[in-house]
Design a protein with these regions (language model features):
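Membrane-proximal helix-turn-helix segments that form the acceptor-binding/catalytic region
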Residues: 118-126, 161-184
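Histidine-centered beta-alpha loop that forms part of the nucleotide-sugar donor binding/catalytic region
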Residues: 21, 74, 136-137, 157-160
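A short, active-site helix/loop in glycosyltransferases that binds the activated sugar's phosphate group
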Residues: 141-143, 180-197
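N-terminal strand-loop element at the rim of the active site
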Residues: 20-26, 39, 43-106, 194
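Short His-centered aromatic/hydrophobic patch
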Residues: 113-116, 134-139
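Extreme N-terminal starter segment of soluble prokaryotic enzymes
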Residues: 13-17
Length: 197
């Protein structure tokens, strides 16, 4: 974005927010998000990572010092985390804390409760950023519903489209019509999305 003011050009660096499962865990998605976030931060972009879960003191991979990390649910054994830990335990024994909005096809659905879901939706609704990047199909679906209209939304896919059940594929396609951009793992997946969107 170029801003012309008094015959000078100022470059307003776009802010990026990544909405992801757990920046504190090991995994391919974590590694790719870390690399991209670090590159953006090195170029001067304000970068925030919203990590739904936290179970360790430090992110698994080293993050640029300018990157902000916001945690929604902290599972470390500390007194201040009692509510989150208790909600997660109780969910296993009662249907009252089942999710209402997260897709039933989310592969890790057992990790989510209505308590976690509410925190996720609130975070998406209140995120102030130029670009919001979802890193999981179910997260992208939530972003398509709850992100502010002025935010550029990106669905970063880390699974092949055909790996999803047929019903989930339909749910994804319907939601992604409200997403601005999609990144895919393969050219074949790119073509599948382009043919349906």
């Amino acid at each position: 974005l170029n801003i012309i003011e008094n015959n000078e050009v100022f470059y307003a660096m776009k802010s990026f927010t990544f909405f992801m499962h757990n920046i504190y865990a090991m995994g391919g998605t974590v590694k790719s998000v870390t690399q991209l976030a670090n590159t953006l931060a090195e170029k001067g972009h304000p970068v925030t990572i919203i990590s739904v879960f936290r179970g360790a003191d430090s992110p698994y991979f080293e993050l640029h010092s300018a990157i902000k990390v916001k945690v929604l649910v902290d599972y470390r054994l500390k007194l201040k985390n009692t509510r989150a830990i208790t909600a997660n335990r109780i969910k296993k024994y009662t249907p009252f804390l089942n999710t209402k909005v997260i897709s039933q096809f989310e592969p890790g659905k057992s990790q989510f409760s209505s308590y976690v879901e509410k925190k996720m939706i609130k975070a998406i609704r209140h995120t102030k950023t130029d670009v919001l990047v979802g890193t999981r199909a179910s997260f992208n679906i939530l972003i398509s519903k709850y992100a502010k209209a002025e935010i550029v939304t990106i669905a970063m896919e880390h699974m092949n489209f055909d790996a999803h059940p047929d019903q989930y594929q339909k749910e994804i396609i319907a939601a992604y019509r409200n997403i601005n951009k999609i990144t895919t793992l393969t050219v074949a997946d790119q073509q599948k999305y382009q043919s349906q969107l």
